């Protein structure tokens, strides 16, 4: 995983204290797979093969998990709820419980949405308008004032 070595990941670490007490973390990485239609037609491309570490959590969600665990450490508890097709998760939500806050990871290969990560705190939030592995476009939004 290269997420933690991206220049903006270091910026995230610097900005983190400014949000105050962290209350919620959201990471979303949803990308309609070019192989999903073949999967629906009965084929088993590697990205949808559990023997090849396929599926939404292992292929895309791992970047969300690396991003969150890299910033906050191992959660106290984690629960994964997946949309399953033919014994593989095509999309899913991983909820991680930390002392005092929750982190949610959304990963999907069967639908698409803008990628983003948000760290919400008592004094504002950090918004990253990119996939967690890219760490692009990091801004801080204080509760009162302009984005930085």
Where are these regions (language model features)?
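N-terminal Rossmann-like NAD(P) cofactor-binding subdomain of oxidoreductases
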Residues: 1-3
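Predominantly a Rossmann-like dinucleotide-binding segment in NAD(P)-dependent oxidoreductases
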Residues: 6-76
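C-terminal helical cap and adjacent loop that interface with cofactors, partners, or active-site loops
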Residues: 134, 144-148
